[in-house]
Amino acid sequence: MKAAIIGAMEEEVAILRSRMEEREEVVIAGCEFSTGRLDGVEAVLLKSGIGKVNAAMGTTLLLDRFRPDFVINTGSAGGFLPSLRVGDLVISDEVVHHDVDVTAFGYAYGQVPGLPARYRADEALVEAAKQAAAQLDGLQAAIGLIATGDSFMNDPKRVEFVRGQFPELCAVEMEAAAIAQVCVQFGTPFVIIRALSDIAGEESNVSFEQFLETAAKHSAELVLSMLTVVQSKAKQ
């Protein structure tokens, strides 16, 4: 079993990289790959860079060259559910682009022509993430829709527009739908797990960088817990 884990920023992969044993590193087209073992599981860790193009390029290289059995995308996101606070977790059941609009030609808002309107995460991986989250004390976890776009959501008008398009939305960020789209096209199971670094449309006296550190720590904890669950299930 080989796991692939993708994070966009150094803060989102640093904890996992530091835990990796037998680590080897290679940079391909600006994408930083680390291979080795995470808590006994063969793994490849990718720091892709921020945004959908970087995420899609990195995921394509990852799947083509390293052939993992599944993909976990980890990192931070902006929360949309009123019940969640900074540091809480969101696990994807579906992922969608929030900045794609080809509705003039009859497609659903967010749908790339020729592809599904939404990308469904692998049910077994979602369940493993859910079980792993339940083992982390003091954190809430929601399972639901995550939306992706190439912008940081700090414009209240944009927040309300996206909320209107996807009323059930749990979180927004900048890579997940691109990763999901590539995984779907390769036929590779995936799940997106994000810890909230901010709440869309809300202001805070604490800096984004401080929240990001908390979110990255919680997201990494969930990845490690999830690998333990997946490994246990594989041995049954």
From Swiss-Prot:
The entry's keywords: Amino-acid biosynthesis, Hydrolase, Methionine biosynthesis
InterPro entries given for it?
MTA_SAH_Nsdase, Nucleoside_phosphorylase_d, Nucleoside_phosphorylase_sf
- Where's the active site on this chain? E12, D198
Lineage: superkingdom = Bacteria
Catalytic activity of the protein: S-adenosyl-L-homocysteine + H2O = S-(5-deoxy-D-ribos-5-yl)-L-homocysteine + adenine; S-methyl-5'-thioadenosine + H2O = 5-(methylsulfanyl)-D-ribose + adenine; 5'-deoxyadenosine + H2O = 5-deoxy-D-ribose + adenine
Task: Tell me the enzyme class.
Answer: hydrolase
Q: Name one GO biological process term.
A: L-methionine salvage from methylthioadenosine
Q: In which pathway does it act?
A: Amino-acid biosynthesis; L-methionine biosynthesis via salvage pathway; S-methyl-5-thio-alpha-D-ribose 1-phosphate from S-methyl-5'-thioadenosine (hydrolase route): step 1/2
What GO terms fall under cellular component here?
A: cytosol
One GO MF term, please? methylthioadenosine nucleosidase activity
In the Enzyme Commission scheme, what number(s) does this protein have? 3.2.2.9
The residues that hold substrate are G78, M153, M174, E175
Keyword Acetylation annotated:
no
Q: Which NCBIfam families match?
A: MTA_SAH-Nsdase, PRK05584.1
What PANTHER family does its record include? 5'-METHYLTHIOADENOSINE/S-ADENOSYLHOMOCYSTEINE NUCLEOSIDASE, 5'-METHYLTHIOADENOSINE_S-ADENOSYLHOMOCYSTEINE NUCLEOSIDASE
**Record-stated family:** Belongs to the PNP/UDP phosphorylase family. MtnN subfamily.
User: Function, please?
Assistant: Catalyzes the irreversible cleavage of the glycosidic bond in both 5'-methylthioadenosine (MTA) and S-adenosylhomocysteine (SAH/AdoHcy) to adenine and the corresponding thioribose, 5'-methylthioribose and S-ribosylhomocysteine, respectively. Also cleaves 5'-deoxyadenosine, a toxic by-product of radical S-adenosylmethionine (SAM) enzymes, into 5-deoxyribose and adenine.
Name listed for the protein in its UniProt record: 5'-methylthioadenosine/S-adenosylhomocysteine nucleosidase
User: What lineage is on file?
Assistant: Bacteria, Bacillati, Bacillota, Bacilli, Bacillales
**Gene that encodes it:** mtnN
